[in-house]
């Protein structure tokens, strides 16, 4: 059974009834509370909104308002999603959203219980993170043409993403104020507002300097770069003086992968982050240090990379030990 693509899910959502006003108000209150309490990003809040609106539209008031749904109603919805070929990972994410939402409903006095706690968590596969080899990374980083301001900017972005293990959302929203060129470090505000400091290597600092001194003024046509709605001046800009989108960077990295002779379907922004982590471990990095660099809340999230590192050591042993 092939999971639905993003476009298929959106098309299916458009076929559902419109959102009832009461449910729309409930979802809006919940998202406002999440933002105030946890400072979640707009991207995360939009994911929560889509999941809750999908359930509300499917229910369409049949089993009562969204905040009063029972375990059987939620189970019916999860069963329907499975029949519509939603992946176990997508259903697991939905269940996590529902647990948070119904906990909020209990806090607000809308109900006395959390019905989602009675639902079984989907069994998930555990795919290992995919990483590029170090030679593939070198080819990918060298793919942009540095003869143009856009190419020089993109080279700097690729270098920075690999050097610091950034998420794509962290890269494209990075403010100038977060870069300390004198000390060679970045201050990153990651998921859930978690802050971390990431050191930069000589190569990434070199390309950042070239971008800031050559490409950025050219892209801005020497005009002052305005602050965005958050009051931050973006580090990486386009010719309209605005920050770049995640989708733009996604397309570029696929393009540069093809130029580097790497299958585009094997490369994504997150693959660069996985490569950063894998290569550090292969060269002897400490797992706790890697956790801090990646901004993981729990060491268990970071531990998946240890299996990849063990594979690397086994390969080295098999290649070089006289009795392997």
From Swiss-Prot:
Pfam families: Phage_int_SAM_1, Phage_integrase. During infection by the bacteriophage Xf-phi-f1, it may be required by the bacteriophage, which may use host proteins XerC and XerD to integrate the bacterial genome. Coiled coil: none annotated. Residues 21-106 form the Core-binding (CB) domain. Forms a cyclic heterotetrameric complex composed of two molecules of XerC and two molecules of XerD. Keywords: Cell cycle, Cell division, Chromosome partition, Cytoplasm, DNA integration, DNA recombination, DNA-binding. One of its GO terms (molecular function) is DNA binding. HAMAP family: Recomb_XerC_XerD, Recomb_XerD. Residues 127-318 form the Tyr recombinase domain. This is Tyrosine recombinase XerD. It comes from Xylella fastidiosa (strain 9a5c). Site-specific tyrosine recombinase, which acts by catalyzing the cutting and rejoining of the recombining DNA molecules. The XerC-XerD complex is essential to convert dimers of the bacterial chromosome into monomers to permit their segregation at cell division. It also contributes to the segregational stability of plasmids. Belongs to the 'phage' integrase family. XerD subfamily. The active site is at 167, 191, 270, 273, 296, 305 (o-(3'-phospho-dna)-tyrosine intermediate).
């Amino acid at each position: 059974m092939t999971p639905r693509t993003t476009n298929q899910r959106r098309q299916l959502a458009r076929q559902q009834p419109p959102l009832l006003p009461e449910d729309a108000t409930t979802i809006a209150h919940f998202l406002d509370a999440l933002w105030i309490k946890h400072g979640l990003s707009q991207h995360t809040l939009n994911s929560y909104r889509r999941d809750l609106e999908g359930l509300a539209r499917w229910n369409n008031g049949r089993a009562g308002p969204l905040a009063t749904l029972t375990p059987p109603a939620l189970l019916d919805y999860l069963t329907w999603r499975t029949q519509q070929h939603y992946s176990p990972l997508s259903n697991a994410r939905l269940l996590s959203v529902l647990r948070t939402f119904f906990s909020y409903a209990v806090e607000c006095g809308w109900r006395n219980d959390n019905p989602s706690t009675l639902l079984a968590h989907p069994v998930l596969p555990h795919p290992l993170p995919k990483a590029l080899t170090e030679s593939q990374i070198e080819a990918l980083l060298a793919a942009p043409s540095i003869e143009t301001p856009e190419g020089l900017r993109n080279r700097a972005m690729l270098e920075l993403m690999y050097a610091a293990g950034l998420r794509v959302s962290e890269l494209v929203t990075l403010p100038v104020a977060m870069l300390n060129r004198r000390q060679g470090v970045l201050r990153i505000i990651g998921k859930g507002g978690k802050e971390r400091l990431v050191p930069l290597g000589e190569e990434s600092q070199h390309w950042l300097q070239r971008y800031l001194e050559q490409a950025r003024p050219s892209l801005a046509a020497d005009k002052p770069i305005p602050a965005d709605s958050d009051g931050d001046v973006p580090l990486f800009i386009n010719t309209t003086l605005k920050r770049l989108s995640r989708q733009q960077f996604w397309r570029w990295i696929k393009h540069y992968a093809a130029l580097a002779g790497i299958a585009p379907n094997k490369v994504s922004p997150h693959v660069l982050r996985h490569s950063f982590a894998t290569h550090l471990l292969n060269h002897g990095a400490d797992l706790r240090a890697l956790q801090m660099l990646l901004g993981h809340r729990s060491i268990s999230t970071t531990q998946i990379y240890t299996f990849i590192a063990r594979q690397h050591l086994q390969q080295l042993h098999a290649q070089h030990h006289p009795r392997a």
